[in-house]
């Protein structure tokens, strides 16, 4: 069996690993359009801040190691078209320009997503950067130590934008974050959390300019200013982090796509064409808290999808179990994590929810290491089933969110969670874990 895998990031990499595990005798061809195999953009902040010294180490696997395991690895090589009826792909060598046709028995594509860029006046000025991929990582790193870069403007206040803002603030730059939304990280966290994080960022030389729309860039050859509908900001460097779009324009007319360009797949990762599977950021994914399909661009999601595509390669035997959309991030001294439904997602889905928020020290009063923690538990008011949670502290409590992710997947209720068994040791916790405490408050709220 000959299997072709497109994409060397999260989903593609995991598909290759699972192929080696379940189909060791398969002929595997692994294609990457770029010149570098398996770069992890989610590790870029560690490199920009100098915690990781070698940009080439920010990866899952080298092409050489995969070659030694029997995989035929092709970098600088683009699959430009699929001919599903013939079980063929058109392949272009981006160095030589030569094209060829490759046959396949099975095809797994993980085309990913590409960053949105603002189509506004001045967009062609120099020093307007993106934050995705190895080449941009190298360019951004150079700017962290460039003495001519003093004012950095980040457009977008999601995870990528906040990572960029923190990296440049730590490099001693004056940073402004602009977003059309009314608060930073508003897609991931509710207001009681983002209020605290906004104060933390402002205390670290970051200006938060939310509720503003960028209208144009200004400059002479290179960007010097950003103008919004409300203000103007000096800018020696602009980092655009306003989301992504699926890299699927080349698939129109070949595979069935949703109106937004995402690839239609079933619960076995199969596309509309036989023997063609799709995974990762260019697909929808089963979202357990709302029992629906949404697009959640997370590495963990793509990795699991890659594995399940291979499990179902020959027969549809393992339906994808779904995800809760769990994620986390550090913002200077604060660490937070979230899973499932928050207020923004509930409104988007039209789902009624109730919630309780607990703010307390996570250790006993006598423990000098105690730190304040914020925990919000979201549940269904009719069934009392757990739907989501958010957690934040200067202590790293983020792993606790994994318990809530499991609770959502297991369809646990607030009553189940209130008396769930968590260990107690004064150096690590309190007799009632903050998860228990929040669930108990929810039970009281429903009496």
Curated annotation (Swiss-Prot):
Its cofactor is FAD. Its EC number is 1.11.1.1. Homotetramer. It catalyses: H2O2 + NADH + H(+) = NAD(+) + 2 H2O. InterPro entries: FAD-bd_OxRdtase (IPR050260), FAD/NAD-bd_sf (IPR036188), FAD/NAD-binding_dom (IPR023753), FAD/NAD-linked_Rdtase_dimer_sf (IPR016156), Pyr_nucl-diS_OxRdtase_dimer (IPR004099). Coiled coil: none annotated. Belongs to the class-III pyridine nucleotide-disulfide oxidoreductase family. The gene is npr. This is NADH peroxidase.
């Amino acid at each position: 069996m000959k299997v072709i895998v497109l994409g060397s990031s999260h989903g593609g990499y995991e598909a290759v690993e699972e192929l080696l595990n379940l189909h060791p005798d398969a002929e595997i061809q692994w294609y990457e359009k770029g010149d570098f195999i398996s770069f992890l953009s989610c590790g870029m902040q560690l490199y920009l801040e100098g915690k990781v010294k070698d940009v080439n180490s920010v990866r899952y696997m080298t092409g050489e190691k995969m070659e030694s395991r029997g995989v035929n690895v092709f970098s600088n090589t683009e699959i430009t078209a699929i001919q599903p009826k013939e079980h063929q792909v058109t392949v272009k060598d981006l160095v030589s320009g030569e094209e060829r046709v490759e046959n396949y028995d099975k095809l797994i594509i993980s085309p990913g997503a590409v960053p949105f860029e603002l189509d506004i006046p001045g967009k062609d000025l120099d020093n307007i950067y993106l934050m995705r991929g190895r080449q941009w990582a190298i360019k951004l790193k150079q700017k962290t130590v460039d003495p001519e870069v003093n004012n950095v403007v980040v457009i977008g206040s999601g995870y990528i934008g906040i990572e960029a803002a923190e990296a440049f603030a730590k490099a001693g730059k004056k940073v402004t974050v602009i977003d059309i939304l009314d608060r930073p990280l508003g897609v991931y966290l509710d207001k009681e959390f983002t209020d605290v994080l906004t104060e933390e960022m402002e205390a670290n030389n970051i200006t938060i300019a939310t509720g503003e729309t960028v209208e144009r860039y200004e400059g002479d050859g290179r960007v010097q200013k950003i103008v919004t509908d409300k203000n103007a900001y000096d800018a020696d460097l602009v980092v655009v982090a306003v989301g992504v779009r699926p890299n699927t324009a080349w698939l129109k007319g070949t595979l069935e796509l949703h109106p937004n360009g995402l690839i239609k797949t079933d619960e076995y990762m199969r596309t509309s064409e036989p023997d063609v599977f799709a995974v990762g950021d260019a697909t929808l994914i089963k979202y357990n808290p709302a029992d629906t399909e949404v697009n959640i661009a997370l590495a963990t999601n793509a990795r699991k999808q890659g594995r399940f595509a291979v499990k179902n390669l020959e027969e549809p035997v393992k339906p994808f179990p779904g995800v809760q959309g769990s994620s986390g991030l550090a913002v200077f001294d604060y660490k937070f994590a979230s899973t499932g439904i928050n207020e923004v997602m509930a409104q988007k889905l039209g789902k009624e929810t109730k919630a309780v928020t607990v703010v307390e020290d996570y250790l006993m009063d006598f423990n000098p290491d105690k730190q304040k923690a914020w925990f919000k538990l979201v549940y269904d008011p009719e069934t009392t089933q757990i739907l989501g949670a958010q957690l934040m502290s200067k202590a790293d409590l983020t792993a606790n969110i994994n318990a809530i992710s499991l609770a959502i997947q297991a369809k646990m209720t607030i009553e189940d969670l209130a008396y769930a068994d968590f260990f107690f040791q004064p150096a690590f916790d309190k007799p009632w874990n903050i998860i228990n405490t929040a669930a108990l408050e929810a039970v009281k709220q429903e009496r």
